[in-house]
C-alpha cells in the first residue's frame, strides 16, 4: 500500500537512509531563507537538493536549528507561558527514552511459567512486561503461536537527547536493563525483535509564529488557523519527582504532574508549523512549536501525521504560487485538506 501511494506521485523521489548534513540559507529581504539541504547518503557521499520550501520532519528539528531557528529544550518556567503545571524555574529535563520490542513464540516451545520478566507467571505462555500485553482477543491469548506480541521494553533517562553520545549511553542502559528478560524469553523459545532505534519522546522544539501551550490543550482551543485536530491527553513520562507520582499530584519541585491526564480535542494551528525566524521552511512532527508540557500531547503519531499532511499541502501551495509559507492563508490549506480523509470538521462542530 505504501509503495502504491508513492508511485501515484510522479514528482516524488524517495531517498532512503539519507540524513541532512547541512542547510543552504540565503539572506532574504527580512528573514534568512532556506533554499535547500545537503544530504548524506553514505559516509563521504552527499549531494545538494535545491528547494523552494523545505519541511523539517526530523523529530529533533536538526534542519531548523542549523538554519538559525530559535529552539526550546527541556522544561519551560511557569512564567514563560503562564502554564499552571510548569516548574518555577526552567531546566533541561526531558522525558525518558523507550526501547520497544516484539516477541513471537516458536512452534513447539514450552510455555513460560516461571522466571518471567518482573517475576510474572503467565500460564498461557505469553510473557507480558508491565502493561504491554495487547492481544486482539482472549482466543489469541490462548494461542500465542498465532502472532507477535508487543513489549514496552524499557524506559530510561537521557541527559541530552540532542547529543548522540548521551543518546548512545541511554541506549546501552536500556539494553542492559532488558538483557535478563531477553535471556528468559530466548530460553523458552521466543524470538525477540528489537526496534532498530530507541524511541526519543522529546528533543528540540522550534519556536514558531504560535507556541502551543498547556492552556490551549486544557481549554480545548481551536485557533482560527487550525490545520490538524489533536486528540491525546497530557502525558509526561517519569517527571523528576522523588516520590511516586499520581495523576494530578504535585512533584518535589512544585510542578503539577500530568501523566496520562485526559483532555478534550484541540487544534494544531498552522502558525505552529511556521518558524518565527526563518523563511522557506516549515516544521512538522514533535519538533513543531509548543511548550514542554504541550509537546507531551502533540508528540504522538496520529497528531504529527496530521500536521505533516498540512505542512506538505502548505509547501506545495507556497511553491506553486511563489509565496512564503508564512504568507499563506490557513483557509487555502484547509480547502485542500478537505479532499482526503482529514477530519478537520471536528474543529468547527
What feature does the model see in each segment?
Residues 24-25:
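Trp/Phe/Arg-rich N-terminal binding region typifying the photolyase-homology
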Residues 9, 28-31:
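Acidic-histidine catalytic/liganding microenvironments
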Residues 17, 21, 31-36, 40-53, ...:
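Flavin (FAD/FMN)-binding glycine-rich loop and adjacent Rossmann-like elements that form
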Residues 6-21:
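A conserved beta-strand/loop element that lines the FAD pocket in flavoprotein oxidoreductases
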Residues 2:
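Sequence context of c-type cytochrome heme-c attachment sites
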Amino acid at each position: 500500500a505504501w509503495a502504491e501511494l508513492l508511485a501515484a506521485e510522479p514528482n516524488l523521489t524517495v531517498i532512503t537512509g539519507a540524513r541532512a548534513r547541512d542547510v543552504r540559507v540565503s539572506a532574504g529581504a527580512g528573514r534568512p531563507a532556506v533554499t535547500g539541504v545537503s544530504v548524506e547518503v553514505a559516509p563521504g557521499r552527499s549531494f545538494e537538493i535545491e528547494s523552494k520550501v523545505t519541511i523539517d520532519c526530523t523529530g529533533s528539528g536538526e534542519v531548523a536549528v542549523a538554519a538559525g531557528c530559535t529552539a526550546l529544550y527541556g522544561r519551560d518556567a511557569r512564567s514563560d507561558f503562564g502554564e499552571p503545571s510548569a516548574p518555577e524555574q526552567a531546566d533541561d529535563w526531558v522525558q525518558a527514552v523507550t526501547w520497544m520490542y516484539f516477541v513471537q513464540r516458536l512452534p513447539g516451545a514450552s510455555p513460560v511459567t516461571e522466571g518471567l520478566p518482573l517475576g510474572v507467571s503467565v500460564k498461557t505462555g505469553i510473557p507480558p512486561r508491565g502493561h504491554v500485553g495487547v492481544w486482539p482477543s482472549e482466543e489469541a491469548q490462548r494461542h500465542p503461536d498465532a502472532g507477535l506480541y508487543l513489549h514496552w521494553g524499557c524506559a530510561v533517562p537521557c541527559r541530552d537527547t540532542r547529543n548522540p553520545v548521551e543518546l548512545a549511553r541511554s541506549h546501552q542502559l536500556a539494553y542492559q536493563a532488558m538483557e535478563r528478560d531477553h535471556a528468559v524469553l530466548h530460553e523458552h523459545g521466543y524470538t525477540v525483535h528489537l526496534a532498530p532505534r530507541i524511541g526519543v519522546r522529546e528533543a528540540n522544539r522550534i519556536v514558531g509564529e504560535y507556541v502551543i501551550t498547556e492552556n490551549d490543550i486544557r481549554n480545548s482551543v481551536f485557533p482560527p488557523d487550525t490545520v490538524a485536530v489533536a486528540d491525546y491527553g497530557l502525558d509526561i513520562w517519569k517527571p523528576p519527582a522523588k516520590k511516586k507520582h499520581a495523576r494530578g499530584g504535585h512533584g518535589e519541585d512544585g510542578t503539577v504532574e500530568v501523566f496520562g491526564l485526559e483532555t478534550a480535542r484541540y487544534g494544531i494551528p498552522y502558525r505552529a508549523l511556521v518558524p518565527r525566524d526563518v523563511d522557506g521552511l516549515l516544521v512538522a512532527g514533535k519538533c513543531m512549536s509548543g511548550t514542554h508540557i504541550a509537546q507531551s500531547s502533540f508528540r504522538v503519531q496520529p497528531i504529527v501525521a496530521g500536521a505533516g499532511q498540512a505542512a506538505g499541502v502548505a509547501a506545495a501551495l507556497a511553491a506553486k504560487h511563489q509565496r512564503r509559507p508564512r504568507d499563506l492563508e490557513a483557509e487555502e490549506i484547509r480547502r485542500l485538506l478537505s479532499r482526503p480523509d482529514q477530519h478537520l470538521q471536528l474543529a468547527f462542530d
